[in-house]
């Protein structure tokens, strides 16, 4: 199974695409029934680049799977780059993360105390 995390290093994403399962026929052609691996890669490439299947087939005509898998991997790396960069920026800002944690903890405590007060009233305990 080919798994990609949106936050993986670009070289890891490329390596996984290069290992993607394809068939022995080296023709890049959309045929989900007979070429499911290649067809899946074509779907990914189409989403990442906006190209239709006919354009993809024409682009890689006669090239084999090696260059196609590399192109798919590179297009996914570029598609995910803004997400990865923003995540890295946010994770590097410790004061921002602490403020988010603190705000979340305060909200959770408020909601928990309201719920606990309702439970105390229903059960008949004295309010805290």
Predicted regions span which residues?
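Conserved nucleotide- and phosphate/pyrophosphate-binding catalytic cores
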Residues: 3-128
């Amino acid at each position: 199974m080919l798994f990609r995390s949106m936050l993986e290093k670009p070289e890891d994403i490329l390596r996984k695409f290069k290992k993607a399962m394809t068939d022995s026929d080296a023709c890049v052609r959309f045929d989900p029934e007979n070429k499911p691996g290649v067809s899946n890669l074509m779907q990914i490439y189409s989403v990442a680049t906006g190209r239709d299947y006919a354009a993809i087939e024409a682009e890689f005509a006669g090239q084999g799977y090696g260059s196609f898998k590399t192109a798919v991997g590179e297009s996914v790396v570029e598609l995910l780059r803004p997400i990865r960069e923003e995540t890295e920026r946010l994770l590097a800002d410790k004061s921002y993360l602490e403020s988010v944690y603190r705000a979340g903890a305060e909200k959770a405590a408020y909601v928990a105390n309201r719920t606990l007060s309702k439970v105390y009233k229903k059960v008949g305990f004295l309010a805290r």
